[in-house]
Each structure stands twice: as C-alpha cells, then as structure tokens.
C-alpha cells in the first residue's frame, strides 16, 4: 500500500495517517513508515492503545472517539453536512498538532472503508493519495468529490504485493527490523476461541496467530522447522 504506486511512493519526511493503528495492518504500517524515514500518525479507538502505538514509533496518536464525523457522508448542503464539516476540520487540526499548522498528510492508509472514507478523502493533502485495501466497517464508501477534483487527490486500490515487495518485507522481518507484534498464539484446536475474540473485539493490540502443523512458536526458517520436527 505504501510503495509501488508511482509517483506516490512513500518518501522520507512525508506524513501518513494510519487508521486502526494498534491492529494487525496498522502496526505493520507504522513500522514500514518508519523504515522509509516518514512520519506515522496513528488513529486509535481506545486510550489504552496509545502507548502501544507510540512505542511502535508513531509521531503522534489521535483517539477517534474524541470526534463525531464517522460513517457515510451527510447530504451536501444540509445542516448535518455543516456539522460534519466542522467536526472534520477539528479532526484536521488534531493532525496539525502533530505535523505542524497547515501541514496535511501526504497519504492515508485506509482500510475501515465506510466509516472513515469521507474523512480520509477530505484530510489528505493537495496531490496526495488515499490508498485502500479493505472495508472492515462497510463497503459503501462516500465522499465529497469536490475536494477530490479541486485538490487533485488520488484514490488508489491495493491488494497485497508483488513478489519483490513481499521478499523485501520478509527480509525486514528476518533482520528483526519489523516486529510482527504477535500478541497471542493459539494451538489449532483453539481456533474458535481466536475467532470469537475477533468477533467480540476482545483481542489484544497487534496480531494473533494459529499454529497450523507447526510444532511450536518462534520458528523463523525452514531449518528451524525441520529441527523442531525432529525433536517431537
């Protein structure tokens, strides 16, 4: 999402807004942004996630529960739209508190979709990019297209990575420059427990994993797997 969409490849010094910064996607995004020499602004939903995101290297954190501008865009020209617009501007000022007055984000790392898309498309800077890979809050994304054409913004879909990008990400992991932020690992028989935690939003910050034919955790290479299997 952050690389491969020329000319909007992430560059040192740029600012990126990351939705769901304490989750699986967001925690990786913040670390990748750091490796590129750019600045991550993480958005969280609970204050107890702030330290986790800051420890990942975010330049700043915003709690979305401090604002009321989520969901589908109200009809343009209505009182509801005016209220939404005022709240979005307040959210933008919270970003400026981190980036500096008048400095909007160059890129938005978007995956909630319906709940956040109107804010993403408004908040990204002139000539910037909103890149989206999912719609975890819904697929009916709305936005005020006037801000799109008048400020020449870009909407970009992203679906995983090509082989070279995947290999580069794996190398960062093997070199321990990326932390998988593995909060919980479940044996295969506890797969339903993991699913229920996701459904009820009870999972810890970071990522969960389930062992699939793996004898134990911490196996980084094929040789590690073979050695662990021989010990069983």
Regions flagged by a language model, labelled:
Residues 1-36, 94:
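Short internal alpha-helix immediately C-terminal to a glycine-rich phosphate-binding loop
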Residues 11, 124-125:
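Helix-to-beta-strand junctions that scaffold the AdoMet/dcAdoMet cofactor pocket
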Residues 30, 50, 117-121, 145:
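Generic hydrophobic/aromatic pocket-lining and core-packing "Φ" positions
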Residues 35-115:
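Adenosine-nucleotide cofactor-binding segment
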Residues 45-52, 139-145, 166:
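Short, glycine/polar-rich helix-capping loops at beta-to-alpha or helix-loop-helix junctions
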Residues 62, 126-133, 143-182, 228-231:
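Rossmann-fold dehydrogenase core element
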Residues 118-121, 163-232:
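C-terminal hydrophobic helical "lid"/dimerization subdomain
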């Amino acid at each position: 999402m952050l690389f491969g969409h020329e000319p909007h490849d992430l560059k040192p010094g740029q600012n990126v807004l990351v939705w769901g910064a304490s989750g699986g996607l967001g925690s990786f995004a913040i670390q990748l942004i750091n490796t590129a020499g750019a600045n991550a602004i993480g958005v969280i939903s609970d204050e107890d996630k702030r330290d986790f995101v800051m420890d990942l290297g975010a330049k700043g954190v915003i709690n979305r529960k401090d604002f009321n501008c989520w969901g589908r865009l109200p009809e343009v020209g209505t009182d509801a739209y005016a209220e939404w617009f005022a709240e979005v501007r307040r959210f933008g000022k919270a970003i400026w508190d981190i980036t500096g007055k008048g400095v909007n984000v160059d890129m938005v790392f978007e995956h909630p979709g319906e709940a956040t898309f109107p804010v993403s498309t408004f908040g990204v800077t002139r000539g910037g990019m909103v890149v989206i890979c999912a719609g975890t809050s819904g697929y009916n994304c709305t936005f005020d297209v006037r801000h799109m054409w008048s400020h020449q913004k870009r909407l970009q879909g992203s679906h995983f990575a090509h082989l070279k990008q995947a290999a580069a990400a794996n190398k960062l992991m093997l070199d321990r420059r990326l932390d998988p932020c593995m909060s919980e690992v479940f044996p295969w028989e506890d797969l339903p427990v993991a699913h229920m935690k996701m459904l009820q939003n009870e999972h810890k910050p970071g990522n969960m994993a389930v062992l699939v034919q793996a004898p134990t955790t911490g196996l980084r290479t094929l040789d590690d797997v073979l050695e662990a299997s021989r010990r069983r």
